[in-house]
């Protein structure tokens, strides 16, 4: 018998083949195309096919934002997911972004089980109902264990995870996998998390915080036949230590496929071979049935995105994202103004989240807002010391490195194993210089507020997004206990409201920071 396991991960609400930057696109990604590919494979197979979603399905696109914020319930979106034919799903970290009540409603509306063994409720039981699922195919039994990154409390608002306990995925797998080996012939672990170490060398590829435990699962938990991963948006397909592994990127660019050849020997099922690959949707057309059913809803979203929100004298268009991070930009300073006005603070931190951000032209639509400010962030004001703020700036300054020809470039720490443009922050309301010719941790100078040097013990109020305020991105100098007030309105709405309050925006650049290299010798970090 051949068992085929198909998997998606980190779809992030990209159902249609569009990034929503304009209408009527046909880009090489999206769940409608993945659905067509799944149907093709199922039609060609006579042996069993399992279809699994590995999490981060509920948030991430204008479609999911519209569903959550305008419709205020997930049922239209979950009815889309129900058309795909998933046999099971797993909770991802972004599932909590719109609150646990919204997540619970979504999970309840799905017609397939959503698994997670290592997120427990206040009774110590799996919070979403099931830890694992058993599938029977004639005389072959397959066990599927769902696991999620334990790092969610470091990113999420406390109200969204109240009453939940997050266990280590590895510790949880050590408990469950031996039991599942007794119940099943094949054990699959679907983990919404990635790899913390290089699969070949075992060298750490990131800070070992527990956010990603894929390498540890692979090497410290025996009995796993297939490990489906995600979260990092990487593209991985391999067989390592006799375990078939996939990670299919994000937004439905790729479909993970694992094929197992299983044979009965002396009354016992034996896996003879394992193959892992990623299938592209580049040549695949969108599922016409799903497209027809939900076209009216998609047009409703497109109309909402096209509504005019505000006007700008000139523009805030972004030509070179790297130059924005080196020298600032009117778009970034506009975001600072929105944050400072909403919170009454004079110091603000924000990021250019992605290199795909185009900024704003003279006429700003809702489409412009949600495709530039892509996360459903709320704002938090933190009270920190001068030492804390300097440490945060040093963390951001580590984004830069110098090439052998002494050109500024992005540090590999912010590019591998996952691009992290969103973890480089720019600040307004203070002045500072980043000198990249100095070692990491010693790059900040001329660090002033209102013209005066900021001292280590100075107390400052700073507005940043909620993700950063609780230490997200390994900004350990920030934490929930330093938050003194919060704005619970989504940042996208705050931007739209700012435009509505101000008839016409004039672009401005604060010119309050510089990135330089002052020394001739090159420091190797």
Predicted regions and their residues:
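Short, compositionally biased low-complexity segments
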Residues: 5-12, 149-150, 300-314, 366-368, ...
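Glycine- and acidic
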Residues: 17-23, 158-160, 316-325, 374-378, ...
